[in-house]
Curated annotation (Swiss-Prot):
PROSITE patterns: ABC_TRANSPORTER_1, ABC_TRANSPORTER_2, PHNC
Keywords, comma-separated and alphabetical: ATP-binding, Cell membrane, Membrane, Nucleotide-binding, Phosphonate transport, Translocase, Transport
Keyword flag RNA-binding: no
Protein name: Phosphonates import ATP-binding protein PhnC 1
EC annotation from Swiss-Prot or TrEMBL: 7.3.2.2
Residues given in the record as ATP binding sites: 35-42
Catalytic reactions of this protein: phosphonate(out) + ATP + H2O = phosphonate(in) + ADP + phosphate + H(+)
Matches recorded under SMART domains: AAA
Domain (ABC transporter) ranges: 2-246
Organism: Oceanobacillus iheyensis (strain DSM 14371 / CIP 107618 / JCM 11309 / KCTC 3954 / HTE831)
Chain's role: Part of the ABC transporter complex PhnCDE involved in phosphonates import. Responsible for energy coupling to the transport system.
Membrane topology: Peripheral membrane protein
Amino acid sequence: MIEFKDVGLVYPNGTEGLKNINVKINDGEFVVIVGLSGAGKSTFIRSINRLVTPTTGELIIDDENILNYSGNKLRMLRTKTGMIFQNYNLVKRSNVFKNVLAGRLGHTGTIRSIFNQYKKEDVALAYESLHRVNIAEKIYNRADELSGGQQQRVSIARVLTQQPKYILADEPVASLDPPTSHQVMTYLKKINREDKITTIVNLHFIDMAMEYADRIIGMRAGEVVFDGPVSEVSESTFEEIYGRSIREDDLRGGAKES
């Protein structure tokens, strides 16, 4: 379980990234965070694995306040927290398989990974992860030879290989076209259901949030302004979250692939 207790974050320049956040996320949930650019979505999600560090409050994960973590405890937190980025965050010159095996770094250690001394179980897990996102045929292609959608599937496979307890996806479809966006979200939802991995996704597109989320958290100016099940969300809810009427560019569009 993840719980924010009166969490605030002030950047060195004085900007408030988070303001008095009180949110509890239960194990196995699929939560979508929505809000305009600058609303605090990325700050919220990156605080969970301490890519940014809140300055006030407590952030409780599995009954421990992670804001006190350093050294080995912080490394262990990041090992059980898989991260998916908008820009894929792959090693472009390495092949797909090496990128996916990198998901085992937290379990294997730097020296063994440098010399590609992965256990047979790790190699088998990487193969399985590639098959689960239907990208195994590109296993020996360099990452920079792939399309954006293919690269994002590789990043999902890498996270699967990490075997995390939590998946954090920071605007994972922002750079993709509508059909590919739906494909990526479908994989994330499928993994959430099959593996019971708590999944938190930042999205701008409200139609995708409605289609894939179990629960929606709305943010504006660093504050949570809505938190509830998707069944309670309407267009007026999004207008309240965004502080304006809904525009065409707030919708991703495109049909979900069958």
